[in-house]
Curated annotation (Swiss-Prot):
Pfam families: Seryl_tRNA_N (PF02403), tRNA-synt_2b (PF00587). The keyword Protein biosynthesis applies. NCBIfam families: serS. Consists of two distinct domains, a catalytic core and a N-terminal extension that is involved in tRNA binding. ATP binds at R317, R318, E319, E404, I405, T406, S407. The gene is dia4. This is Serine--tRNA ligase, mitochondrial. Catalyzes the attachment of serine to tRNA(Ser). Is also probably able to aminoacylate tRNA(Sec) with serine, to form the misacylated tRNA L-seryl-tRNA(Sec), which will be further converted into selenocysteinyl-tRNA(Sec). Its main location: mitochondrion. Belongs to the class-II aminoacyl-tRNA synthetase family. Type-1 seryl-tRNA synthetase subfamily. Its EC number is 6.1.1.11. L-serine binds at T287, A288, E289, E340, T438. One of its GO terms (molecular function) is tRNA binding.
Length: 479
């Protein structure tokens, strides 16, 4: 499918400035690796439009939602949010009459011809100026505190989401059945790939949890990536190759805020900036969701129903504390290739779009002949931005358990309020809803394909859908 500049421009409509409407599709994927170190987050350099009224009027439900998501510290701030809103209103009620009085006295000074009376009015105006400045400082601090507390409040949770920790996940559907029986000859993906997955040299070059893929494994990685992109394009998703470096405030607006130090996933860049120039810090993306969401930053979509994009990029994650047998090999890397779906929809369409993304993921996994299951994930497993999340887990024979390969989230207007992404139609206007989903997390799909399609002779049968991309029916077959 060939995507012209005109078609891409039509796809985005009036949402982007004309200078950003051009697009050149690259059939060959080029990956740029970037060095980084970790520092701390900065606050956003713009103001999100938060729903203070909802939090105030539904404080008990908001607090319960935080507790259900295992965000006890944030739950404890909800009463403080209510008191700050009350305090701000009270201060404004005192402040505005002072402003009116100050304005009236200024007019009286201009009209006054009596020097003595004028002197009294000037002194009174000075006193009012000092008072209004003090009120301004207090209101500014209260407003900022209120904003920071509310910014940390997670999205509302849809009623269909199970309440509790990970073990409360509900199996919605199973896909296929195990192809490989557990026998003495069963191998894990590292044993199957042999030198095709080189962790040792990568550890010397980059550190723990990096890898080189070579030979048939490198071909398999490129085949899955290209197939995932073609699969998405055939279903109406517009291809994008996004930047892998974004501003940290963009990542924060998307909901990538750490619950604690160990949960922090973001690599921030430690780069020189001039003391004379104030510029936001940057970070490496953990998923293309972040840079794709930024396409809608401060934009208004006109004549809007939905927009759908699919991005391919490298992804970078710190994965702090991720060790152990289940995380060995390709399962949990600091850097990997990922194909991501992202959609903006009218609020009335987000539920339908969520189902479309999950069905896309299910069909994609089915075409690779990978046994899997679809899970409705519970509250404690939801990120701050998600109102619901479905995961697909693939059966991984060597570990005799399932491992996550995709996730899909409906973020409602959480990200749109923080990124100022709106829509305007003839009949209504407001904030869009955003959704995201994994099309292909390449390393884990490699694990699933190698282990589920391994043969007794040590080869791996290539799923039929990948044969046109890899140009062979078996991997590791002697020539």
């Amino acid at each position: 499918m060939r995507l012209t500049n005109r078609r891409f421009s039509t796809f985005l409509g009036n949402a982007l400035p004309s200078k950003k409407k051009g697009f050149i599709f690259m059939s060959q994927l080029l990956y740029l690796r970037t060095f980084s170190t970790h520092t701390s987050y900065l606050r956003s350099s713009w103001q999100a439009i938060l729903n203070y009224k909802y939090i105030y009027q539904n404080a008990e439900a908001v607090q319960r939602n935080c507790i259900n998501r295992n965000l006890q510290a944030i739950a404890e701030t909800v009463p403080k949010i209510r008191s700050l809103i009350d305090e701000k209103e009270s201060l404004k009620n005192e402040f505005f009459p002072l402003l009116s009085l100050k304005k009236e006295i200024t007019l009286q000074i201009e009209r006054c011809s009596d020097p003595n009376e004028r002197g009294k009015l000037v002194n009174e105006a000075k006193g009012l100026k000092k008072k209004t400045e003090e009120y301004n400082k207090i209101i500014s601090k209260v407003t900022n505190d209120l904003y920071q507390y509310c910014l940390a409040v997670p999205n509302t949770t849809l009623p269909t989401v199970p309440v509790g920790p990970e073990d409360k996940a509900v199996v919605v559907q199973k896909i296929g059945s195990p192809l490989v029986k557990k026998t003495g000859s069963l191998k894990d993906h590292l044993q199957i790939a042999n030198e095709g997955i080189n962790l040792e040299d990568a550890a010397q070059a980059s550190g723990h949890s990096f890898c080189y893929t070579t030979g048939d494994i490198a071909l398999l990685e490129m085949a899955i990536t290209n197939y995932a992109m073609d699969f998405a394009i055939s279903k109406g998703w517009c291809p994008v190759i996004p930047p892998t470096i974004v501003r940290t405030d963009i990542a924060l607006a998307c909901g990538f805020q750490p619950r604690d130090e160990e949960g922090q996933q973001i690599y921030e860049l430690d780069s020189y900036t001039s003391p004379l120039v104030s510029s936001p810090k940057q970070c490496l993306i953990g998923t293309a969701e972040i840079s794709l969401a930024a396409l809608g930053f401060k934009k208004t979509f006109n004549n809007f129903t939905e927009r759908k994009v699919v991005g391919v990029s490298r992804a970078y994650r710190r994965e702090a504390g991720a060790r152990g047998k289940e995380n060995r090999g390709l399962y949990r890397l600091h850097e990997f290739t990922k194909v991501e779906l992202f959609a903006w929809t009218h609020p009335s369409r987000s539920s339908e779009m969520f189902n479309e993304i999950v069905n896309f993921q299910k069909e994609f996994v089915e075409t690779l002949k990978i046994p899997a299951r679809i899970l409705n994930m519970p509250t404690a497993e939801l990120g701050s931005s998600a109102s619901q999340k479905y995961d697909i887990e693939a059966w991984m024979p060597a570990r005799q358990s399932y491992g996550e390969i995709t996730s899909a989230s409906n973020c409602l207007e959480y990200q749109a309020r923080r990124l100022l992404t709106r829509y305007r139609n003839d009949k209504d206007s407001g904030f869009v809803h955003t959704l995201n989903g994994t099309a292909a997390a390449i390393p884990r799909l490699i694990i699933a394909i190698l282990e589920n399609h391994q043969q007794e002779d040590g080869t791996v049968k290539v799923p039929e859908t990948l044969v046109p991309y890899i140009h062979k029916e078996y991997l590791f077959k002697a020539k």
